[in-house]
Amino acid sequence: MTTFYLSLIISLFFLIITLKVFFNTSRKFKNLPPGPQCLPIIGNLHQLKQPLHHTFHTLSQKYGQIFSLWFGSRLVVVVSSLTIAQECFTKNDIVLANRPHFLTGKYIGYNNTTVAQSPYGDHWRNLRRILSIEILSSHRLNSFLEIRRDEIMRLIQKLAQKSYNGFTEVELRPMFSEMTFNTIMRMVSGKRYYGNDCDVSDVEEARLFRGIIKEVVSLGGANNVGDFLGFLRWFDFDGLEKRLKKISKRTDAFLQGLIDEHRFGKRNSNTMIDHLLTQQQSQPEYYTDQIIKGLMVVMLLAGTDTSSVTIEWAMSNLLNHPEIMKKAKNELDTHIGHDRQVDEHDISKLPYLQSIVYETLRLHAAAPLLVPHLSSEDFSLGGYNIPQNTILMVNAWVIHRDPNLWSDPTCFKPERFEKEGEVNKLLSFGLGRRACPGENLSQRTEGLTLGLLIQCFEWKRIGEEKIDMVEAKGITAGKKTSLNAMCKVRHPLKINDVF
């Protein structure tokens, strides 16, 4: 009972502080962007419905291309204009170079010290340099080319074995997910953890890893009101913080085990872990085990689900638009022919295939609200005053459907990217110094996968009804229903070498 009253007193104390901060901030800044009326304490949290980018779209239609909300005591500004977004990350790029801190960043992101969550400064610059040079540089990506090619060809082989004798129904989502996770994990550690042919000899190790990833992804997409109403964290009603603490310990132990395995020479040397451990020997202060584990977490969470989601959306659109599929197939037949499979170095010579990827990213950005930013000082934006410690979100989903920027904005039309400069209007990977550094890897994987799927197979929908394009609710904007389709090997194409 004593503990209960103590918790109650502490909660009331934080409640009073929250109210004081809320009303003081509201009075201090009179030229904030417009927004809906908010309630004491909770602000506008009661108005937030999933998917958030749809809710923000509705609000932007009423309040304009820049509007404000209160998530509890935290001010949030939402931008739905390309011009204002560009102003954010050119003129105000340094001011908006920080990230807000959430519980997931504390427990999964090593207390907000990874390159994704770290505050802007020397530590972040060092992490970005490591990521850009040691992991995602063109040289390093080229050294991992065989891994990407092998994992994609394993996917093609599975589909070919199923459909060599005629059209066969296949479920594509688990295949895409398996391919992207195995690709990243082989780059990181040299191991495959997914599929019946995974090469992890310890079955328990593979099961443990898959369980960790599933829970991390689930908790990473959870809505946590305690991030905005701090006094609720004392109660942890839904047990989220307790689960985050538990999974963070399991994740850390697993990643540390991988590092130790490579440190003592039990794996091959062409992996991300090995390259970073080599640097650790000469620069131990920059390449600590925690930094390496943080980079591993970022690669796994940012480089896997997003690519598989994009490929699934692309195939869904192609199945709904067979004339676009046919045009892409003709491009491949003309430039590549029937005697070999398309390869990664061919993608730059296949503009229509690239346009399909761009159009998919336009309509179905995996992160439709990008990653939130945090202002480090007061600044002006779009004629309004934005105070320090404001969370800024960019609704790329709305910008990518702006009729002032795109003709027939809701239609899937890859041809629009034949016009020079159109690709510069895409925000799928963010803008400014904190834009996603994995764009090159992502587009290599997506381009080659789609190219081979189109080149090697005939595709059609299961029935006359079009593919359902409803979005799921989650941290990445994937399809609500898994993609099933009919596929058949293109017999004129010589693909016997994939068996």
UniProtKB/Swiss-Prot annotation:
It is an enzyme of class 1 (oxidoreductase). GO terms for cellular component: membrane. One of its GO terms (molecular function) is heme binding. Keywords: Heme, Iron, Membrane, Metal-binding, Monooxygenase, NADP, Oxidoreductase, Transmembrane, Transmembrane helix. It is found in: Membrane. Its cofactor is heme. Belongs to the cytochrome P450 family. It is a single-pass membrane protein. Heme binds at residue 436. It comes from the Eukaryota. Its EC number is 1.14.13.-. It holds the Pfam family p450. The chain crosses the membrane at residues 3-23. Its main location: membrane. Gene3D superfamilies: Cytochrome P450. PROSITE patterns: CYTOCHROME_P450. InterPro entries: Cyt_P450, Cyt_P450_CS, Cyt_P450_E_grp-I, Cyt_P450_sf, Plant_Cytochrome_P450_Monoox. This is Cytochrome P450 81E8. Probable monooxygenases exhibiting no activity with isoflavones such as formononetin, biochanin A, pseudobaptigenin, daidzein, genistein, isoformononetin and prunetin, or with flavonoids including naringenin, liquiritigenin, apigenin, luteolin, or kaempferol.
